Amino acid sequence: MNKIYFFLLAFLLSIQAEASNYPEVLFENSLMPKSYYYSQSSFQGNSWINHMNGHLPVADSVFFTPGNSLMLNYISGNSGEWQSAIHYSDDYGHLPKNNDLLIFKIFVSSATAKAELPSIQLAQGENISEEIKVEAFVKNYQDNAWLSIEIPLKDIGNLDNQAPISSIIFKQGANRDGKEHRLFIDQIEFLPNKTPDMKLTGKAVLSSVEAHERHVDIVWQLPLTPSIRYIKIYRSEDNRNFSPVAVRPISFNKYTDFVPRTNVSYYYKIAWVDYRYRESPFSDVKTAETKLANDDDLLNSIEKSHIAYFTNETEFNSGMHKISPLVSEASVSVKGTGIGILAQVIGVERKFIPRQLLLDRLKKIVRFLGKATTYHGAFPELLDGRSGKPIMTDSCEIAANIESTAYLMQGLLVARNYFDKEESDESELREAITSLWKNVDWKKFVKDESGYHLYNAWSPACSYTRSSPIGGYNSSLIAYLLAIASPSHAISQESYNFGFKQPLKYIGPAIGRLSTSLNDTLIVGDSGQKPELYSREPFMIDSTYYGVRLMAGSVQNSLIEQQQPFLAFNPKNLVDSSINYFDNQRDLSNVYYRAALDRSEQFVSITNLLWPYVGRDSASVNRFNPSAAIATYPYTPTIALEALKNYYRNLGNLLWTEYGFRDEFNFKDNWVSGKFDPVHQGIVPIMLENARTGLIWNLFMKDPDIKSLVDKMK
């Protein structure tokens, strides 16, 4: 029985890993309506292509896979040119193989002859392939039907097999008829010329549907069938007329459907889809009844979805948090794991996940950490979840990251206090956590015995060569607090005042700069290295912004960066005669809120107030982070709850996912992030729960070593 179980589990993991990386999909759907951000169009002369601020239009009524496609609307003039590049949305692209096919679907809706179709090229950064005529690869050509175009990569000249494909370029071909053409493009991907072709005869299995106010969580049970490529989700409001709403890759077992209305019954069914897009028999139909939620139920719903990011995105071998749901390599994040532990403790307390499940996961984590590579007990930020070895590009980068280690230890200390039963499993977990905690030699991250600043990294090959001092009103606070609290390798308590509260900013090599006033600068050297110059930056600012007096922090920095120190450490317990941290967090939240009010007219026609801006620099001034606004709930509950309801009820169709709110968005550029960040996903349930019950704050502050720290700091 056990052998069968492990064989099936290994098989499932192998096909999930394959699906995560393979096939490579260049375009499936646009996350935003109207235009596709990851495209770039241009024309000249008497040619033309329809675009919106340089981006291809998105069509939501014509698609091959739900819910949209890209529209190519063009005129090929006799003295002009047009082209449109569609880019990968990430930095990886697709590394071509000799047996790969470039496959995409086209739908020709106008009177367009086969010879009037565009040409294509593939881009690999600056390298551009030879031009290929699409007409040469069309079979059974017809209008108003989806056609599959399959082009062997070996037939495309000037491709570099060692460089990833970054874009496909549709462009004006040899035909210059001067007529207007309209066609739609969907599902651009690279597949091997041979794919699993087992017929999907068994009907799909829909496990459950769970209704919330405006979203429905749909969960399925995937069979061990290698020819399944996607799960296709259908929705109906009358249990008769079903429409497809989404497809999901097999690396997911859940889809969250953000529905148009609440207080409505929705009916769902699913089908498996193979590599040729043939569908299996439908699953049974399940019903979800949405209803308007009160505040408490809405907060529960938000917390549950964000916590699911950590419960689902767990690396199998180590139990640690894996860095991407769509990458099969076993890279895990040390900091993300620490934040994930906090979120999952909330999940257990709220009965979203079983206590035993998290206990077993934590036991796996501490076993893995006990064998993983460390430097003076501290961990690198990225580890291989299979081997426990660092993931870096060169010997200098194979180093311990003290801030990532601090966030991991913070999570483990909370777990040590949560799993407090006198049972063998829980006592063994506490002992293992204590061993890891005591093993971190924080002193090794201070350059010399007379120094006060923690340095963010240390490498056995390069010592502090690529390391920088940390400090200031930001996420580094928890590293200083834990370093002072350590029962085995504590740094001086004075590091709080003379390290954390005296942040240093790198200026450059000290040579040639010695005339700079020593009152404003500090020369920091390391044995065998040239001295470097740092400026002392102010910690206390005592300034007024938008009528709010702010003692510390910066309105130039990300709000979420300044929220991180207080995920587990209750700011009310950090005694400092010069600053009340809880009040300062409240004031900082109000400053960001009022700054957004000052510019709210930009978006008043489409939504309520959007805040906070990600940053004040030109690159991020129009980007917003939903998590940062919601995470102010312990300090400014009224405006935080307003923000949560706005992002969910008014903008949920754009921002809500299986894992809660998206990372960032920019309406000016019609962009939303398709990636997730553990800080952004974790800070929402953690700070909501801290405001509601104080759970994480209470668990962390009751730790004996943290209690001793608080006494020291008084």
PLM region spans:
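Conserved aromatic anchor
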Residues: 214-227
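Short acidic/polar inter-strand loop motif in beta-rich domains
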Residues: 175-178, 274-279
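Bacterial Sec-dependent N-terminal signal peptides
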Residues: 1-23
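Beta-rich carbohydrate-recognition modules and glycan-binding surfaces
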Residues: 17-200
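Recognizes extended acidic, P/S/T-rich segments that occur
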Residues: 230-263, 275, 281-282
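Extracellular and select intracellular beta-sandwich modules with Ser/Thr-enriched
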Residues: 184, 279-285
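Ser/Thr/Asn(+Pro)-rich, low-complexity disordered segments
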Residues: 209, 213, 252, 262-265, ...
